[in-house]
């Protein structure tokens, strides 16, 4: 059947319309017809039609039509299986939502794609067939048979048939990975004169190339069977395409022999055979023999199949593996040219392990627009090979050195599923078993876009679940020309270089890579800085500019995403390169509210949040800390050793960067050492002789200190006993560092993009022109055997400190992006990822987040080292022993203005002082805190938008942003010790935009006298006045509380402090005060901040030792806070002197008396916000809680009347006169003693509404803290509670608590959760039942099908509603049958259905039995509804309520 030559509009049914345009019609004709069709649709259907665009995305189409869904895929190809399901679900949802709705299927090109959609939807609706739809199905079948069936490709029909089988249940999804060993062609195609054929094969997974074979030369005298050996075996999973080409002998062209697509889920057994009629292209090609067929041979392992020798070719078949012909490299479907072929630059096929990219002169011509136009001169000789990017990823190929710039190729369109589509698809496919069970596969592509002039590099990864320690493979990219044995540079970190797999005799140095699901390097830590001959870097704005690109990893996605930075040849010393990792917390939305023009907030196509930060381009100075370099494993070691190795914080020699016109260089850092002696010339400070020994001593010292206060504390294992198997001891087990996030870019610097990664303990900054690659939500949770204990917590949460009050950004060259990292313990924090939680919204309130549960959406899990105490869910972080920090209400950000003076020869040191006013200790809660981090503890600020945790040695670190320079050019300062427990100061120049943090186990021993040498100030030339303090001691805390940021608001980062836990161990945090003299400030130069990380609990001990001097200057008028909603810092009109909060420790030995010297006072404070912030209680509940308390008692809650505001309810001594005049009854007067005030959130901060004399505060904690000191506009001072008022009510008045619980239960609560499984427990109950049920579920084969259910708790019991009716419709468990509810005591996470989620369950009586129990398991689904909130509600409100129904 031939396709038509004009517009074809067909009403398939009354509500399904197909509109197709021939591929050859002109643009004018297409646009004219499109406008006509649009007018007809609008006149007939109004805005009630949805356009499903099966072709490339077009602006015209989007502009003309109100609702359009771009779901296109390449013509003549089968769509991905998940896309088919997405289209069907979207179509059904749209048609069912309104009887007036119609669907318009638009396609430009072959109608085969329309046939795919119509036949798929026909099968989709047939599952839930009804009589009234029978006519529609008949109409669709008739259209399919008459119009489009003959136009469909065999692969398209194969996919439709597979989907039909899945929907009907006749086909069971094969979820196990398959390793392809052989592709056998039965029958030699006759593509050249004399029966000669020169086939070569390409394998694609998710339309990305993963393997390219050599060229097989088959003559007419050879047998009619060609066996293409895939060596090493290629792991395939999901949508697979095999494409076979014939390379013409005397011309630079190739012909497609056949193409076939299939889904591995449909493969039953280990063999597939496709006849000629099943092959795309070949089915209608006379050159392919009629008896010909293609056979694929799989196995379950990558090992060579025993007894397969007979399959190999005889000696007459010659295989050419070593070719640099660019013809072989055209393979990426990422950017399609007009004829559907893919253009590709030359790349390796000889199996080289490392791939490299060389820049070429921009004046040289690139590869022309099509396969026919490749000049022979583009195949250089083989004498001088440079490793280039191989899009096949299975094979990196040696190609010749050309020294040319990137070629620009024809434009193409590419679209991934939107975040919402993916979320819906996850739900839809979860029943089919299509969800990716933790493993993700990304392939390397090297394609160019005409409009961006860039190179897309997406390295291949293959991850294997379970114990596939020797089976998985990964190829990444290096750009250094170095011997294979020279793997001591950071570049080696970019590739997991293991040679434990078999080598092919033809593949040279290519080896089988070993990887695992949590392979950190597989997340893309492999790009390196290079040189830019033009000396100019232009970022990628999607415009017509050349520049560095980024790459991102997507979670569970099979579609290519954004590219990564180009890999270029570095200058002289390639041994030290920087790696970068970015991080994003859900609290970023707080800061985004007040982002100034310097920041933009957007979402990536797959729902990943993106920060775009601009910084001045005219700031030439740049000093940055570079990561230390560990010894990377040699070729004979496992790549997991590389994954588990840490990179310390080390200097970057100046000669690694090309001097730019602006003379940007990198001075050395006096406080940094090189770990493992990665270069003696790099070591500028004393290196510890035995870092492992130092770490162990520090850990044990901390253990002893904590045991003094808490005998139940379980000592943290030391490096020796926990990591005895680790190859080198360059990293502490508590290294959970992140990387760094944002830095300034100078457009005229001469260096390429680079990475800076705090990998298990590195402090790193991104150099000039650098740009962080995007990291996605990929899972890296390693199941493989032999895993070292701390590898799962190897990456802490990284973050970004932005100082966005910048000058107007001059050009697009100043934009850089920071993306979210993927890490299973942190994945709950990504707002844009879990979108489907709102699909089934109910009017029932959400579960109140009780004091045990936080009020933000982030989540951090126990790393393997954390003590096994009962876990409490926390979206922010889990402190030792299950303590959880609070979020918004107790967070407080501080700003310390930097004076315009260099740091003196003696750098600032911290000292601790335990004396403080109790009320202020409690009120200040989590404001300014520095505390210690025991090994293995991962810290995260619960409402911190971005923050970096970097670990290099057990020394505390504070980051300051100075203001002795133009606003918006922050000065980062870090306290990093040259030796253990000797905190010293080193600084970054103003062009750096980050403030790195080190989370540390902090030994409380006396710090030695050693200070940073005077050279530490060599690069600080901001002034000459000494740093000192002109403030009295009592102003120190007030200065932090009242520091305004000058003219423009600066988003700064709230902190989280630890609170009291169930075991009664109070968690204390350091409160660091950095006073100083502010004489050098001008109003326009203030506005920088200090961010101090919240840390795990420490014993309350004094450190009476050497006095410390402060860095920076603070005055009460130059301080600020971060608003929970605005995220910006604001000016607070405080009195010059605040009450005396603290006294300096008398035991401290003062420094020499000098006008600017002052002691730094460090205070312990306790988090109390969880006592007074009750987000979800009602006004009546607040009155009930407070009416019997003493005056000054208060509660802060979320306002129900004013969205986004807070309500302050406080008890007063006497009611207002207006109330007394009403002669109310005594009972009513008691209620009137509780007065209510509205706390409004404004761009300036939070304040009491309607009170003119009330200042603005940066957070609720700050507001509460100040009003506990002076009442201001309130009737009296606030009394900071020392315990939870809910607990007091429960103890003092059980009946009151019961009534409150009954009210909550009557109202009910509900949210969406993942339903995992129901396991019969006989008579077992309690935590053991939850633990056993989850253990059974995790090993169950096949794994149980999970689905999203609506979980409602009411006075009648628990009701589950399956949103998609996949497993059941509705289940109800009466309240008297529910026995127990709790989180998993082992704190295991559910990662199958997306981000890592906590698991909880409840035990209920089995229906009809008085003794048998059933445990029902669930996992978190909605980030705003943590599992602990649900468990608390069920346990304390429903089960704990005496009024059972």
UniProtKB/Swiss-Prot annotation:
Region annotation (Disordered) ranges: 358-421, 538-568, 618-695, 717-769, 859-981, 1076-1127
Comp. bias intervals (Pro residues): 864-873
Record has Hydrolase as a keyword: yes
Effect of residue 1206 to F: Significantly reduced interaction with PEAK1
GO function term, MF aspect, one: phosphoprotein phosphatase activity
Comp. bias (Polar residues): 386-400, 723-733, 914-935
Residues with the Phosphotyrosine modification: 780
GO CC terms: cell projection; cytosol; focal adhesion; podosome
SMART domains: PTB, PTEN_C2, PTPc_motif, SH2
Ranges of residues in domain C2 tensin-type: 175-301
Induction remark: Down-regulated by EGF.
Modifications the protein undergoes after translation, according to the UniProt entry: Phosphorylated on Ser/Thr and Tyr residues. Phosphorylated on Thr-323 in the C2-type tensin domain following EGF stimulation which changes its binding preference from DLC1 to the p85 regulatory subunit of the PI3K kinase complex. EGF induces tyrosine phosphorylation in a time- and dose-dependent manner. Phosphorylation of the SH2 domain enhances interaction with PEAK1.
Positions where Phosphothreonine occurs in the chain: 323, 632
Extent of Basic and acidic residues compositional bias: 548-561, 1099-1109
Keywords, comma-separated and alphabetical: Cell junction, Cell projection, Hydrolase, Phosphoprotein, Protein phosphatase, SH2 domain
Result of altering residue 323 to E: Constitutive interaction with p85
PROSITE patterns (alphabetical): C2_TENSIN, PPASE_TENSIN, SH2
Domain SH2: from-to ranges: 1172-1282
Compartment(s) where it occurs, according to its Swiss-Prot or TrEMBL record: Cell junction, Focal adhesion; Cell projection, Podosome
Domain PTB: 1310-1444
Protein name: Tensin-3
Organism, as annotated: Homo sapiens (Human)
Gene name tied to this protein: TNS3
